[in-house]
Amino acid sequence: MKEKDNFEMVINFKRAFMGRRNQRTKRAIKMIRNIVQRHFGAEKVIIDPLLAKSITYNGRDKIVRKVRVAVKKIGEKTYLVRLALKSE
């Protein structure tokens, strides 16, 4: 099986909207970590501050519904998650 070093994926935050409104950002960040750990077998997941800022650009309780992320392997079982930008 081919190693996943660079990968783009879309993460849907539908489950982050369940529960209290002021916990949405925390749940969304935790969802990103859990999804990357599950798909790549990562032990350490580093989230880019620009990605966290783009999730909450409307405020802490009004997060975006979906986000496209780029996952890059930077070490042994260590992954960096960044915001994937469209190239035109």
UniProtKB/Swiss-Prot annotation:
Q: Give GO terms: molecular function aspect only.
A: structural constituent of ribosome
**Which keywords does the record carry?**
Ribonucleoprotein, Ribosomal protein
Does the UniProt entry include the keyword Cell cycle? no
The record's InterPro entries line, in alphabetical order, gives: Ribosomal_eL31, Ribosomal_eL31_dom_sf
An example GO BP is: translation
User: So what family is this one in?
Assistant: Belongs to the eukaryotic ribosomal protein eL31 family.
Query: What name goes with this protein?
Result: Large ribosomal subunit protein eL31
In its UniProt entry, the species of origin is given as: Sulfurisphaera tokodaii (strain DSM 16993 / JCM 10545 / NBRC 100140 / 7) (Sulfolobus tokodaii)
